[in-house]
Swiss-Prot record:
Compartment(s) where it occurs, according to its Swiss-Prot or TrEMBL record: Cell membrane
Record's keyword terms, sorted: Amino-acid transport, Cell membrane, Membrane, Transmembrane, Transmembrane helix, Transport
Record-linked PANTHER family: ARGININE EXPORTER PROTEIN ARGO, ARGININE EXPORTER PROTEIN ARGO-RELATED
Entry protein name: Putative amino-acid transporter YggA
Native source species: Aeromonas salmonicida
Matches recorded under InterPro entries: LeuE-type, Lys/arg_exporter
Amino acid sequence: MFATTLQGFTLGLAMIIPIGAQNAFVLSRGIHRNHHLLAATLCCLCDLILIGIGVFGGANLLAASPIGLALLTWGGVLFLCWFGIRSLRSAWQGQGAALADSPRLMGVKSVLAMTLGVTLLNPHVYLDTLMLLGSFGSQFAEPLRPAFAAGAMLASLVWFYSLAFGAAALSPWLARGRVQQAIDTIVGLIMLGLALQLASGALLAS
């Protein structure tokens, strides 16, 4: 049982740790101590639900709906392009931008909307949780699947809260003007790169 949980935890971390839209957004909220725990909590909740659905048979739902997957993919492309351009604009404005005009600080509703956007409009999230974790988890006997799912869910909790708390703890250094400009630039390029990757994959598959 413990070995199965450890497998779920290890595979879950392997899926979550590579930089992506969720990680970049939680990191940016942590740097500004701007509802970072809210963002981390919502990312975790979405992951817990999707991991549970995937491990207990939901992987077939995504595979059986190519039209839905295509709509999700292109919606994700548009969202990631918007997010990337927004981050690059913030980097370009730099320290001279007025705080009121800066996209770096957000209200609760904006953080909720953005977190749901980088999660539910991100096809990689579904591929990781529903397809990969779901397919791997389905190989276990039914009595062991809850242990595997628990391990993967624990990985999500540990990672997102560590990222949020770590970014907040290092915010005095990370929030410096030039450092923040560099982070905004990197995040923007990552978002545009993910959008390009999604778009090219969708075009090749069509």
